[in-house]
């Protein structure tokens, strides 16, 4: 059975299963954001110290994305996905059992290894498995899976953690991954590696100034976002003085707004990707500047979160579109680099938020995050003027 002869129904089932896998991988990366206070309590540690777990995870993904992608470039993709899921599930069992914080961090490193490879191959696999002429929709489904991790995965993970303990959240993610693995084994055909690129692709990509500029923009804007977002749960409870339940609601609003951002980008992204990204970054700057003033009431924080969620989703989707358009000849290498760079930003933001919370005041995380966000806004305007044509999305062939 090949990808060319299967029915459209089976082809879509394969893409949907990949989207569910994307949902699970993104949920586990972000779910600690909603569990920091609970994990800190169980290990009798300050919340800001537990937050270093976010930085370690993100930087392991950043460092290992490209090396692991190159090491596995010749491995048949179905077998590779199965191996990734086995590592992913085993690491979640270890998270569930973690008897101290060090063991929890080790388990998260195992998950990060699986994550590093998964995100470097997923976009190209979705395109290969999609029904004819439906490549853009397949990528959109993967993006939806990613968005739903913020909308449903993170808040549900937090609710489970609130009522049953954070260990149960990690165990439940492992069970979800096991079910997805069974579906992948049943649905996926053999998928020989193709168009994955190699080390030879790197000098070629590094000689593309427009692409390098997008990578730089990505790391700066993601650092800005995660400086505040990584600590939003303790911020709501300790700075704003609001309830743990409202922290859950706020995460739900932030994620739900991401779906609106996804719809907006889906409608306008093909024609207006560049101005949309700049407008979204400007919106991010405003939201970060207003984070502390908005902490005076639940309604103000809720409204701010809607605009924040829309902005970060448009930014994330826009960056992916730019990278894929600028590196159609080495998508796996380009996306592995993108995943790595995105995670450098996550780790840097979480680290900055950690240091600000420990040595200054958690109340200022919005103001501190707004500084790189403003730099990103200026840089986006410069590069979209410098490369107006080459940065637009190339048409699907």
Swiss-Prot record:
Gene3D superfamilies assigned: MFS general substrate transporter like domains
UniProt KW Transport keyword: yes
Alphabetically ordered keywords of this record: Cell inner membrane, Cell membrane, Membrane, Sugar transport, Transmembrane, Transmembrane helix, Transport
PROSITE patterns: MFS
A GO-annotated cellular component: plasma membrane
Membrane-crossing segments per the record: 15-35, 50-70, 81-101, 103-123, 136-156, 169-189, 209-229, 246-266, 275-295, 301-321, 333-353, 364-384
Bilayer disposition of the protein: Multi-pass membrane protein
Location(s) in or outside the cell: Cell inner membrane
A GO MF term: carbohydrate transmembrane transporter activity
Alphabetical list of PANTHER family matching this protein: PURINE EFFLUX PUMP PBUE, SUGAR EFFLUX TRANSPORTER
Function: Involved in the efflux of sugars. The physiological role may be the reduction of the intracellular concentration of toxic sugars or sugar metabolites.
UniProt family annotation: Belongs to the major facilitator superfamily. SotB (TC 2.A.1.2) family.
Protein name (Swiss-Prot/TrEMBL): Probable sugar efflux transporter
Source species: Citrobacter koseri (strain ATCC BAA-895 / CDC 4225-83 / SGSC4696)
Organism classification: Bacteria, Pseudomonadati, Pseudomonadota, Gammaproteobacteria, Enterobacterales
Gene expressing this chain: sotB
């Amino acid at each position: 059975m090949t990808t060319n002869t299967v029915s459209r129904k089976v082809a879509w089932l394969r893409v949907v299963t990949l989207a569910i896998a994307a949902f699970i991988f993104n949920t586990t990366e972000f779910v600690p954001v909603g569990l920091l206070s609970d994990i800190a309590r169980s290990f009798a540690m300050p919340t800001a110290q537990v937050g270093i777990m976010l930085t370690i995870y993100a930087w392991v993904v950043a460092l290992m994305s490209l090396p692991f992608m190159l090491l596995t470039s010749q491995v048949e993709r179905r077998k590779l996905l199965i191996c990734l899921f086995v590592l992913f599930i085993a690491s979640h069992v270890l998270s569930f059992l973690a008897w101290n914080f060090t063991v929890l961090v080790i388990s998260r490193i195992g998950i990060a290894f699986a994550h590093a490879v998964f995100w470097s191959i997923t976009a190209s696999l979705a395109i290969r498995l999609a029904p004819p002429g439906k490549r853009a929709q397949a990528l959109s489904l993967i993006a939806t899976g990613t968005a739903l991790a913020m909308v449903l995965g993170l808040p549900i993970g937090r609710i489970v953690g609130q009522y049953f303990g954070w260990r149960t959240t990690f165990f439940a993610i492992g069970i979800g991954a096991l079910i997805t693995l069974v579906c992948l084994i049943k649905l996926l055909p053999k998928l020989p590696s193709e168009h994955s690129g190699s080390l030879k692709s790197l000098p070629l990509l590094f000689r593309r100034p427009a692409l390098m500029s997008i990578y730089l923009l990505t790391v700066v804007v993601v650092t800005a976002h995660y400086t505040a977002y990584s600590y939003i749960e303790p911020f709501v409870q300790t700075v704003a003085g609001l309830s743990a339940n409202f922290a859950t609601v706020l995460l739900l609003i932030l994620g739900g707004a991401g779906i609106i951002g996804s719809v907006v980008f889906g409608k306008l992204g093909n024609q207006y990707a560049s101005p949309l990204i700049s407008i979204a970054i400007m919106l991010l700057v405003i939201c970060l500047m207003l984070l502390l003033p908005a902490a005076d009431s639940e309604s103000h924080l809720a409204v701010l979160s809607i605009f924040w969620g829309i902005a970060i989703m448009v930014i994330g989707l826009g960056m992916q579109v730019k990278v894929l358009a600028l590196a159609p000849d080495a998508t796996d290498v380009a996306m592995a680099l993108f995943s790595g760079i995105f995670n450098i930003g996550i780790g840097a933001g979480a680290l900055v938020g950690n240091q600000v919370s420990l040595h200054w005041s958690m109340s200022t995380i919005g103001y501190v995050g707004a500084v790189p966000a403003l730099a990103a806004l200026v840089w986006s305007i410069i590069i979209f003027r410098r490369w107006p044509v080459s940065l637009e999305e190339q048409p699907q062939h």
